[in-house]
């Protein structure tokens, strides 16, 4: 391990860590990035959605060589019960633009590519190295990290914590609390391989067009959670995630949940004949605005999942991670160019930039939504999906029963399940949390 001092140390080589490291290295800072995995992305085998405008702000010409799977032209939203789904979808040829807005990616490939860009920009990336603790000076300022390499210490003016939602470095140092189980989801995912032409036929795609399905309902067995399906070039990323607190309360097994989701009559035909080659579990921050910890201090900043920056309502995580990492890197670069000290007062520039961005604005707008869905999960994820399915079937079934009788039966079913006050109360709380 080198003994030289760096301008910045970035702990973690995921979306936020790579964005921060690149932002600083490309501006001439001496950057060391530590990754505990064998290579960046080795612990992220799952698929994901990448939002182009966030990456364009970091690497404008990323489309030239980034490992992109498909650009998304169709979004489907499903409300599922045990045997059916009621859905809506949006598809537009406008998304077949010269510079598409969203892509599916395989994190293992993408993270490795982005880390390579960090190296090309002048950063140093050291893999299979775990940061075990922060190093402090006598004034209480972080001045580096200790590693598992024979207890070695690496010094820097500032440390960027991009260690993920369950990172121990920040919690051990007392910079943040261990996230509460109600604010973290466990997602289990599989990668199903199919020929490219089969995927195109099943989803009505041409070229490198892609489709995303996001689903909620009885598939989560009364827990707050969602299922998802992403189309890649020659594979399908399939998974489901629920709050850890719900798993603890119900004793449901995550993989059993995924297995049932795969066998659902709306999903099974889409993955029939596929070969499963990869399985992964991943923790996702779900607490939203109210769960955001301290973002900066004397000699340190927190970015990405470690800062609970994930928009669960709009299913946005990677773009918030890249945006926060970029802003942290830019703020540190500005402070460095001014000859400033990396103390809490100076590093608050990062928080100011974040507060003025869409990241915090969007999260604060719907700060009450995570709590509402968590405390009312049986209604929103079981009762209403079943009622909606029943209403939809009543609407389309024709068997000689007068329409007025079907309408009365549908209304009665809703009132039996929730009552007038319950329906109005749920609607008001949902609207209030959404605005």
Swiss-Prot record:
Record-linked Gene3D superfamilies: FAD/NAD(P)-binding domain (3.50.50.60)
Main function: Could be required for the formation of a functional nitrogenase Fe protein. Probably accepts electrons from FixA/FixB and reduces a quinone.
Organism phylogeny: Bacteria, Pseudomonadati, Pseudomonadota, Alphaproteobacteria, Hyphomicrobiales
Keyword Phosphoprotein attributed: no
Cofactor(s) essential for the protein: FAD
Name this polypeptide is given: Protein FixC
One Pfam family this sequence matches: FAD_oxidored
Alphabetized InterPro entries for the sequence: FAD/NAD-bd_sf, FixC-like
Keyword hit for RNA-binding: no
Molecular function terms, GO-annotated: oxidoreductase activity
Source organism of this protein record: Rhizobium meliloti (strain 1021)
Keywords attached to this entry: FAD, Flavoprotein, Nitrogen fixation, Oxidoreductase, Plasmid
Annotated family: Belongs to the ETF-QO/FixC family.
GO BP terms: nitrogen fixation
Taxonomic superkingdom: Bacteria
């Amino acid at each position: 391990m080198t003994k030289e001092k760096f301008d910045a140390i970035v702990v973690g080589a995921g979306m936020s860590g790579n964005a921060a490291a690149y932002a600083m290295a490309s501006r001439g800072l001496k950057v060391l990035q530590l990754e505990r995995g064998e290579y960046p992305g080795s612990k992220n085998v799952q698929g994901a959605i990448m939002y182009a405008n966030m990456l364009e702000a970091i690497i404008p010409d990323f489309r030239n060589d980034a490992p992109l799977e498909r650009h998304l032209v169709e979004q489907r939203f499903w409300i599922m019960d045990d045997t059916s789904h009621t859905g809506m979808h949006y598809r537009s040829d406008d998304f077949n633009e010269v510079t598409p807005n969203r892509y599916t990616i395989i994190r293992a490939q993408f993270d490795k590519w982005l880390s390579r860009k960090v190296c090309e920009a002048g950063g140093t990336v050291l893999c299979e190295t775990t940061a075990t603790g922060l190093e402090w000076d006598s004034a209480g300022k972080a001045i580096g990290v200790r590693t598992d390499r024979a207890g070695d210490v690496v010094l820097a003016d500032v440390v960027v914590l991009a260690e993920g939602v369950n990172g121990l470095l920040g919690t051990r140092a007392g910079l943040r609390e261990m996230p509460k189980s109600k604010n973290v989801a466990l997602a289990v995912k599989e990668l199903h391989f199919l020929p490219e032409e089969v995927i195109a036929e099943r989803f009505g795609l041409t070229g490198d067009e892609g489709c995303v399905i996001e689903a909620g309902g009885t598939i989560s067995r009364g827990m707050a959670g969602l299922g998802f399906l992403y189309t890649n070039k020659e594979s399908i990323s399939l998974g489901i995630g629920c709050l850890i607190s719900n798993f603890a309360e119900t004793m449901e097994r995550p993989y059993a949940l995924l297995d049932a989701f795969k066998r659902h009559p709306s999903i099974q035909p889409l993955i029939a004949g596929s070969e499963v080659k990869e399985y992964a579990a991943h923790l996702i921050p779900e607490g939203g605005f109210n769960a955001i910890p301290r973002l900066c201090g004397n000699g340190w900043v927190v970015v990405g999942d470690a800062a609970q920056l994930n928009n669960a309502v709009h299913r946005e995580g990677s773009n918030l991670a890249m945006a926060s990492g970029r802003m942290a890197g830019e703020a540190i670069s500005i402070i460095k160019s001014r000859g400033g000290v990396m103390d809490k007062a100076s590093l608050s520039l990062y928080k100011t930039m974040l507060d003025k961005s869409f990241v915090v604005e969007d999260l604060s707008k719907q700060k009450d939504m995570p709590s509402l869905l968590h405390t009312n999960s049986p209604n929103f994820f079981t009762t209403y999906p079943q009622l909606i399915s029943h209403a939809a079937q009543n609407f389309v079934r024709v068997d000689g029963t007068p329409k007025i009788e079907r309408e009365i039966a549908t209304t009665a079913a809703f009132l039996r399940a929730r009552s007038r006050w319950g329906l109005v109360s749920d609607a008001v709380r949902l609207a209030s949390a959404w605005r």
